[in-house]
A protein has these predicted regions:
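Acidic, Ser/Thr- and proline-rich intrinsically disordered linker/docking segments
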Residues: 2-3, 9-86
Length: 86
């Protein structure tokens, strides 16, 4: 089952933008808190609540892994992933 998350994405040399991503709950291997990066400050300038939490997730895709910064605390992301599994 896929879970919809909101990713903070910043292509090299460009501004941060928000994008919806759908990930398989079984493909997420780690979730950790993300704070203090300049990308987060740019995101807050886009209108994201200043109290919002962010997490960095690791996604396993066909033998390769990639990371993504998403909106939500690690507990919130885990709850979304677990909701799909139950």
């Amino acid at each position: 089952m896929l879970v919809k998350l909101v990713e903070l994405h910043k292509p090299q040399g460009e501004r941060v933008f928000l994008d919806e991503i759908y990930v398989s709950s079984s493909a997420v291997t780690t979730i950790r808190s993300e704070s203090g990066s300049s990308m987060l400050e740019e995101a807050k300038q886009l209108g994201i609540n200043k109290e919002a939490s962010f997490s960095r997730i690791t996604i396993s895709e066909g033998g390769m892994t990639r990371t993504a910064v998403v909106v939500g605390s690690p507990a919130e992301i885990q709850a979304k992933l677990n909701k799909i599994l139950t």
